[in-house]
Amino acid sequence: MKIKNLSLSFFTVILLLFLIEISLRITGSGPRIIHDFALNEPITNIPDENLGWSPKIGQHIFKPWSDEGKITKLTINKDKSRVTGSDNLQKKKIIFIGGSVTQGWAVDDLETFTSFIQSKSKKYKISNFGVGGYGGFQSLLLLEKIFNNNKDIELVIYGYTPHHEVRNVAAGSWMYLLNFFSTRGFVRLPYASIDKKNNLVRNKPIKYINLPLGNKSALIAKLEKKIMKIKSLKREYKKFEISKEIIKEMNKISNENNSEFKFLILENLPKEKIDKYKDFLIKNNIALIYCPMPQGKEHVVKNEGHPSALGHKITSECIYKEIEILNTN
């Protein structure tokens, strides 16, 4: 009798799991997928023990993103910055840090807003240290590394987009996307948190959980997502506070190295969010540059989604006007 009951219970559980699996697939969920981007584009990143990943030195050639597009080059210098059109290392430096919008993903080397600014500046060397996928915390870690290897940096500009707040805390949703894009070199992610006194806490890189059969079962893939979501939930609630502490640390490190620091907003924000940042920046004596990328089809790369060369050009003009040292003799 006990064996019969156990068998019945076992088959009931199997049937229930099977029905859940079918239900998930019908409603659009599926097994874990990792897309092999190496089939269609060069791999531009390599693993980094502390940063998670870093740009791969050399020139990377991309096919057109659409029938209307063109071949583009993404060239990474020996110092891991992107080419901006000037090799004069004797000049004082203005450096930009941030994610893919700052880096200029999907446009050519000389079509990024940093390159457009460089073309107008003969006095300063403009260095673009933006890295695709980076948030504020990775940019902070990179900034520390930059200061260890560079002198004569007069100005540091952090190019912010709202999604950086999600990246800073290794939110479950972002970890899922990084896993999907992992063939681009995104494997592990360092993240930030804060303690009870709102002090910034630095956490070592982590990776997405890959359970057995997650690439075969929608149910197991869903369980992976839930686990990552639960693990990051408390940090996500504090993501704005964490973002502020990261920015404060960027400003502090810049000042300690005799550099000015500016906070650059590259995406339109709701008024409430802008006001919160303005209050924070004023309180901490940090300068704001508000130059969001323009919207509209002509301002994004077709079939890719990142800002186009025209979008970068327009934004570069806005940024140039806001950098006082570029507008003085």
Task: Annotate each predicted stretch with a short phrase.
Residues 29-120, 294-299, 329:
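Membrane/wall-proximal cationic-aromatic binding patches
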Residues 6-8, 303-329:
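Histidine-centered active-site loop/cap adjacent to the catalytic His
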